[in-house]
């Protein structure tokens, strides 16, 4: 019983060690010099969930400046009916 618990503890330690490596996310708008525009709903859809919520920057990897601009442009696209406020389930 104790040997089995020891193995589980070791496996947990291995999982924690493997998690430390991650790739730094780079802001797509800074790297490629892309302008954010509300008239391009296909480009904006990449930054909203399937439920219609705006994805946070820790997931998308955008910088703070472009995340603010992105939120404004998504809201603008919703106002002129290029993007839905809520997606159907």
From Swiss-Prot:
GO terms for biological process: translation. One of its GO terms (cellular component) is cytosolic small ribosomal subunit. The keyword Ribonucleoprotein applies. The keyword RNA-binding applies. It comes from the Bacteria. It holds the Pfam family Ribosomal_S18. GO terms for molecular function: small ribosomal subunit rRNA binding; structural constituent of ribosome. PROSITE patterns: RIBOSOMAL_S18. Gene3D superfamilies: Ribosomal protein S18 (4.10.640.10). Keywords: Ribonucleoprotein, Ribosomal protein, RNA-binding, rRNA-binding. Binds as a heterodimer with protein bS6 to the central domain of the 16S rRNA, where it helps stabilize the platform of the 30S subunit. Part of the 30S ribosomal subunit. Forms a tight heterodimer with protein bS6. Belongs to the bacterial ribosomal protein bS18 family. This is Small ribosomal subunit protein bS18. The gene is rpsR.
